């Protein structure tokens, strides 16, 4: 990637109902950063990610993409973002192949069909490409969603529990992909309970309403 990118948070605070999940979240992540958000269930990790991408409202503070608040540049920010949440976001009536083809068209990805076949093989769906997603297992549906990572040109990847329903080999394949994306100038931010091993990985932990590195 020829550009440098930066995601910055300033004094973010999150409250859900009467519960304060976290306060005073100040971080700067730049091109090359590979970051894991840690913390026990229900502590606010998913809420943080949803605030970072503009899907949830913070109580206080602001999120900046390349120095500009994301609220004032939604179209640009969405173009630069790939977000994968708890739900796969795939179309159950479409096959694995059709889902990837649909994503390719929607994202204006110019990679050829050879790349689609390569990605299907990488995620272990070769031979199942013509089966409707609704008939596949949860793990296989998750792989369809994750396959979009190999097709994406977005510099910012924000991923909520990307290793869910993925075997040990799949975890290593994804970790390698995340490392490659970071070393090529992208930013990867994800939540996971997995003990991810990478020399590039930075860890941020949410505990007692605060984040620490």
From Swiss-Prot:
It holds the Pfam family ABC_tran. It is an enzyme of class 7 (translocase). It is a peripheral membrane protein. The keyword ATP-binding applies. InterPro entries: AAA+_ATPase, ABC_transporter-like_ATP-bd, ABC_transporter-like_CS, ABC_transptr_haem_export_CcmA, P-loop_NTPase. GO terms for biological process: cytochrome complex assembly. It catalyses: heme b(in) + ATP + H2O = heme b(out) + ADP + phosphate + H(+). GO terms for molecular function: ABC-type heme transporter activity; ATP binding; ATP hydrolysis activity. Residues 7-213 form the ABC transporter domain. It is found in: Cell inner membrane. Its EC number is 7.6.2.5. Keywords: ATP-binding, Cell inner membrane, Cell membrane, Cytochrome c-type biogenesis, Membrane, Nucleotide-binding, Translocase, Transport. ATP binds at residues 39-46. GO terms for cellular component: plasma membrane. Belongs to the ABC transporter superfamily. CcmA exporter (TC 3.A.1.107) family. The complex is composed of two ATP-binding proteins (CcmA) and two transmembrane proteins (CcmB). Part of the ABC transporter complex CcmAB involved in the biogenesis of c-type cytochromes; once thought to export heme, this seems not to be the case, but its exact role is uncertain. Responsible for energy coupling to the transport system. NCBIfam families: ccmA, PRK13538.1. This is Cytochrome c biogenesis ATP-binding export protein CcmA. It comes from Pasteurella multocida (strain Pm70). The lineage of its organism: Bacteria, Pseudomonadati, Pseudomonadota, Gammaproteobacteria, Pasteurellales.
């Amino acid at each position: 990637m020829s550009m440098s990118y930066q995601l910055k948070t300033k004094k973010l605070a999150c409250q859900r109902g009467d519960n304060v999940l976290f306060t005073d979240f100040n971080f700067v992540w730049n091109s090359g950063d590979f970051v894991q958000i840690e913390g026990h269930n229900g502590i606010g990790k998913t809420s943080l990610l949803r605030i970072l991408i503009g899907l949830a409202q913070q109580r206080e503070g602001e999120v900046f993409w390349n120095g500009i608040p994301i609220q004032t540049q939604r179209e640009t920010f969405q173009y630069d973002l790939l977000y994968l949440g708890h739900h796969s976001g795939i179309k159950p009536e479409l096959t694995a192949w059709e889902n990837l083809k649909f994503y390719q068209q929607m994202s204006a990805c110019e990679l050829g069909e050879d790349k689609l076949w390569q990605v299907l093989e990488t995620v272990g769906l070769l031979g199942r490409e013509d089966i409707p997603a609704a008939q596949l297992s949860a793990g296989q549906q998750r792989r369809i969603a994750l396959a979009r990572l190999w097709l994406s040109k977005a510099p910012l990847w924000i991923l909520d529990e990307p290793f869910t329903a993925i075997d040990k080999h799949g975890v290593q394949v994804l970790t390698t992909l995340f490392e490659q994306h970071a070393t090529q100038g992208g930013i990867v931010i994800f939540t996971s309970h997995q003990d991810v091993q990478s020399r590039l990985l930075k860890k941020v932990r949410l505990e007692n309403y605060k984040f620490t590195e």
